[in-house]
């Protein structure tokens, strides 16, 4: 495939639904079963460390399973043999064909057409190399990816800055440095990056004049005074009490812009808050483990009915989180991709190509009007050798949150807040 001009969408020969790549490679059943909730096991590993950080004080944490899934799914399209098998297992799909039909992959396509959400994807390939037509087709058809040649060999810093600029533009400046300094060098062959941006307005906004400061109780027993959003009159909300915790569903206004081609709404987003009971019987870390390891936990614990609310207090918060995923992915069974796997389906002459690092960064702000959130995942690939009872929901202590697409159950953002004042 000839080198592509800067910003030019991928083009290539027409293929079938699998983009002309093999779909018969099967993931190990045990791994696929463990990870079928779309990269949530990775979120479990990273979230555990965040909860234990700071000598017990913890650290606010957010990750985008959707962004991470999309990045590794595209890498899987270019992998072959055992390398692809491991990636499919990590992504929770038994085959490449099933991966292409997954709810997360379908939602990614819809995000590009919604007024308040966006998904952008790019691939940068060294000028001396070429993407295979099959991989080019897969990237274009499923992710509307744009390709740019990059001079990694002689100007790696300039190439890094270009990737970061792409992500910054796609996230409206919320994420500016997904690739840190020295993350690419002359041995870099390919960088794949995506960006998710979400802006949701509450269907029932909070009035700023009602916001007040009150203590938020920290994990170490201390407290900080934080701004709490509330309502001045009793009303009904989607709230439910479960053993050890209470769940609150805060829907966003329908940003789907009507029905999709299949006759159903394109998207219906909401934020789910899971608040451990104040008696301390269920720890934040234990609730988080349940959320990321139990199949359909978030869906099953999303309140389905409205109930009267006596008191409603939700803190405003704003923070960012970033991490490198290679070590955690190794723990979860992905090894060949980092040690010189088979990526012959991605780049011509792809022998010895390996994933050097996977970078992820996410940010979120929640206030009286709604939520603004963004995330980016970048994969750097190098060449070897080169009428219910009333319920209270007073979130004055650490809690979990998730931004979820209701129709598919796909999790766009997942995290916890241990201090709403910490950025």
Swiss-Prot record:
The record marks 384-385 as: Reactive bond. PROSITE patterns: SERPIN (PS00284). Keywords: Protease inhibitor, Serine protease inhibitor. GO terms for cellular component: extracellular space. It comes from the Eukaryota. GO terms for molecular function: serine-type endopeptidase inhibitor activity. Residues 1-25 are annotated as: Disordered. Pfam families: Serpin. Residues 370-394 are annotated as: RCL. Probable serine protease inhibitor. The reactive center loop (RCL) extends out from the body of the protein and directs binding to the target protease. The protease cleaves the serpin at the reactive site within the RCL, establishing a covalent linkage between the carboxyl group of the serpin reactive site and the serine hydroxyl of the protease. The resulting inactive serpin-protease complex is highly stable. Belongs to the serpin family. This is Putative serpin-Z12. It comes from Oryza sativa subsp. japonica (Rice). The lineage of its organism: Eukaryota, Viridiplantae, Streptophyta, Embryophyta, Tracheophyta.
